[in-house]
Each structure stands twice: as structure tokens, then as C-alpha cells.
Regions:
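Non-catalytic alpha-helical scaffolds and adjoining flexible linkers that form interface surfaces
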Residues: 1-136
Length: 136
């Protein structure tokens, strides 16, 4: 729902589709990488400068914190570490990130929760089931 053309966003999406079409390895993680990179174009990237090992991730405020926030939109220290690693994933290295189906589904659920928190106009998506089927 952009009021004017967003050329960087369009270029990112076009490039992503091109990469997916030629990708030979790592396709199972493509959707995770795409969604995390898309955050920056939509204006709600996690603040990685606040990350430290053992910190919680406050999904509501997009920051890492040494103490658990009082709301429930939090990743514990282990999940926060995985999330921090994921933010370093790009289309060139995503084949090196190994997750089983359950881990990938849990990560997708967390990313979609993060999206809903920062884009309240996003209704419940039906696409997670499609993404799980395609990238499994």
C-alpha cells in the first residue's frame, strides 16, 4: 500500500525471483531469507547492534535485551541467537544454514509474528501453509 513507486523494493523483489529461479542449493531457506531481508524495505528491521549472546529478543520493539520484556512477544536467549544468525543469511550463503522441517516451520512462525507486530494491517496469512509445502 505504497503511495508512490518504491523502486528499491521492486528491484529487491525482482532480484529475489531471479535468484530463486537459478538457485540450485538452499531453496528450503529461501522464504526465510526473503522475509527477513524484506523487513528492511518495510522499515522494521531488527536492531542488530543491540544483540549480545544470552540476550532476549523483544519482537515488539525490534531490539535485543538482557532481561525478558514484560510482554509475551519475546524470543528466549536460544531462539534469539538463532534469529540473530538468520539476519546474516543472504541469497549467497543460505545453503549453509541447515534446518529440519520443524525448525524451519518454527522460524517461519516467529518471522510472521514479527511481521504482524510491525504491520498491523496484515491479516492472518494463508500463505504459511503454501510456503511450508513449497520450501519443504
Amino acid at each position: 500500500k505504497e503511495p508512490e513507486p518504491n523502486l528499491p523494493l521492486f528491484a529487491f523483489i525482482a532480484r529475489s525471483i531471479q535468484v530463486l529461479n537459478i538457485m540450485e542449493e538452499g531453496k528450503a531457506n529461501f522464504h526465510l531469507c526473503f522475509l527477513l531481508q524484506l523487513c528492511s524495505f518495510l522499515g522494521f528491521s531488527p536492531n542488530m547492534e543491540t544483540y549480545r549472546p544470552g540476550y532476549f529478543f523483544d519482537m515488539l520493539n525490534g531490539i535485543f535485551s538482557p532481561s525478558r520484556p514484560i510482554h509475551t512477544y519475546t524470543l528466549d536467549a536460544r531462539e534469539a541467537e538463532v534469529f540473530a544468525r538468520l539476519t546474516r543469511m543472504d541469497f549467497n550463503n543460505l545453503r549453509h544454514f541447515k534446518f529440519n522441517r520443524g525448525e524451519r516451520n518454527a522460524i517461519l512462525d516467529r518471522i510472521l509474528t514479527y511481521y504482524r507486530l510491525h504491520q498491523p494491517d496484515i491479516s492472518e496469512l494463508r500463505s504459511p501453509e503454501i510456503l511450508r509445502a513449497i520450501f519443504d
